[in-house]
């Protein structure tokens, strides 16, 4: 019973996160922290622009609260909004900006390079951006852009690297955008992957059916 409840809560939080991700596009949504209290459920929303989460005269936050209560069966939801202090070090926000730029027709390479400069300029120890899908033409491929220090696998990668995956809907199809950031304050282990100061690009092609 405890395990079933735990799984149910995780699924619920994931659905709420997806709802906020869609609803709070203009707010620069990052993530939520959901905690149950004796009087209800406290949901802390982290975003680049808290004003968009609250809305004019609190209209948006009221709408979010009502939706959580009626459609997601959240008991007495209490929404608190916190601003992300360093948006260029938040992989969700960085990934969303990249996806939005791609949807507006910006070239993926220029967009990725610009994002990496902002991330590293904010003091990150390392950053990796992976763009996958039909970027041009009918053939799917994966483009990787990296700078700084990055741990790619094992426990250090899970503990030290913040990751996010976003989707960009283009005319040729859906493109995946993965962002990995190693923040300035992390303590690096002895074994790390050292990249040069130049942004590196790696292209990987995969088979895709011709339409």
UniProtKB/Swiss-Prot annotation:
One of the protein's GO biological processes: translation
Q: Tell me a GO cellular component.
A: cytosolic small ribosomal subunit
Tell me, in a sentence or two, what this protein's role is: Binds the lower part of the 30S subunit head.
The Swiss-Prot or TrEMBL record describes its family as follows:
Belongs to the universal ribosomal protein uS3 family.
One matching Pfam family: KH_2
Domain KH type-2, which positions?
Answer: 16-85
**Protein's UniProt name:** Small ribosomal subunit protein uS3
Q: Which domain of life is it from?
A: Archaea
Q: Which UniProt keywords apply?
A: Ribonucleoprotein, Ribosomal protein, RNA-binding, rRNA-binding
Q: Which organism is it from?
A: Methanococcus maripaludis (strain C6 / ATCC BAA-1332)
InterPro entries assigned to the protein according to its UniProt record, in alphabetical order? KH_dom, KH_dom-like_a/b, KH_dom_type_2, KH_sf_prok-type, Ribosomal_S3_C_sf, Ribosomal_uS3_arc, Ribosomal_uS3_C, Ribosomal_uS3_CS
Q: What GO molecular functions are on record for this protein?
A: rRNA binding; structural constituent of ribosome
> Assembly and partners?
Part of the 30S ribosomal subunit.
């Amino acid at each position: 019973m405890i395990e079933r409840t735990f799984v149910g809560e995780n699924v619920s939080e994931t659905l709420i996160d997806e709802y906020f991700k869609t609803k709070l596009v203009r707010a620069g949504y990052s993530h939520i922290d959901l905690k149950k209290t004796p009087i209800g459920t406290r949901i802390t929303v982290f975003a680049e622009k808290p004003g968009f989460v609250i809305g004019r005269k609190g209209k948006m936050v009221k709408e979010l609260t009502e939706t959580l209560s009626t459609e997601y069966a959240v008991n007495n939801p209490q929404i608190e909004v916190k601003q992300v202090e360093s948006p260029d070090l938040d992989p969700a926000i960085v990934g969303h900006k990249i996806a939005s730029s791609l949807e507006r027709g910006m070239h993926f390479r220029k967009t990725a390079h610009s994002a990496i400069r902002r991330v590293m300029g904010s003091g990150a120890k390392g950053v990796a951006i992976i763009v996958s899908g039909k970027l041009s033409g009918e053939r799917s491929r994966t483009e990787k852009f990296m700078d700084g220090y990055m741990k790619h696998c094992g426990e250090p990668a899970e503990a030290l690297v913040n990751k996010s995956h976003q989707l960009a809907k283009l005319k040729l199809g859906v493109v995946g955008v993965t962002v990995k950031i190693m923040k300035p304050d992390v303590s690096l282990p002895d074994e790390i992957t050292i990249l040069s100061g130049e942004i590196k690009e790696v292209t990987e092609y995969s088979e895709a059916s011709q339409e």
